[in-house]
UniProtKB/Swiss-Prot annotation:
Gene Ontology terms describing biological process: FAD biosynthetic process; FMN metabolic process
Enzyme class, spelled out: transferase
Cofactor: a divalent metal cation
NCBIfam families, A to Z: cyt_tran_rel
Record's protein name: FAD synthase
Domain of life according to the entry: Archaea
Pathway the protein takes part in: Cofactor biosynthesis; FAD biosynthesis; FAD from FMN: step 1/1
Catalytic activity of the protein: FMN + ATP + H(+) = FAD + diphosphate
One Pfam family it belongs to: CTP_transf_like
InterPro entries: Archaeal_FAD_synthase (IPR050385), Cyt_trans-like (IPR004821), FAD_synth_RibL (IPR024902), Rossmann-like_a/b/a_fold (IPR014729)
Binding of ATP, residues: T11, F12, H16, P17, G18, H19, D96, Y124
GO MF annotation list: ATP binding; FMN adenylyltransferase activity
PANTHER family for the chain: FAD SYNTHASE
């Protein structure tokens, strides 16, 4: 039996419930979920800052999550390289991923003979800390209000 392979990608810097929701959703679409974790250098180029957690630690944490079968580091040369190697049946984009829109990604992959289903996750359950940025803001707020003592 051929397994249906699902791939998603992200930074995963400061894991939070939103990450977990995307990963559960992605796993529900197939038999095998492989996650591409962004390299530190790539994050710096896209977000203008290095991630807080180093890439290998982020990869290990993501791979330890129940929905994930395997986590790999992305390519420094070509963002599409891991996708071209993995040949997924489904690609899941997070709600805030803007590097590619669905149509552009389809067109790029078609040039290589790949035609995966591309799905954008839209089902965030709103919770107080569904983004790394919200977590950092709350830590700063509590620290400034002296609710956190170091």
């Amino acid at each position: 039996m051929v397994k249906k392979r699902v791939v998603t990608a992200g930074t995963f810097d400061i894991l939070h419930p939103g990450h977990y929701e995307v990963l559960k959703f992605a796993k529900s679409l197939g038999d095998e979920l492989i996650v591409i974790v962004a390299r530190d250098e790539t994050v710096k180029k896209i977000k203008g800052r290095k991630p807080i957690i180093p890439e290998e630690q982020r990869r290990e944490m993501v791979e330890a999550l129940k929905p994930v079968d395997k986590a790999i580091l992305g390519s420094l040369k070509n963002k599409l390289e891991p996708i071209l190697e993995l040949k997924p049946d489904v690609i899941v984009l997070g709600p805030d991923q803007t590097t590619f829109d669905e149509e552009t990604l389809k067109e790029e992959l078609a040039k290589y003979g790949l035609h995966p289903e591309i799905v954008r996750f839209k089902g965030y359950k709103k919770c107080p800390f569904h983004s790394s940025f919200d977590i950092v803001k709350e830590i700063i707020r509590r620290f400034c209000n002296k609710e956190i003592k170091i």
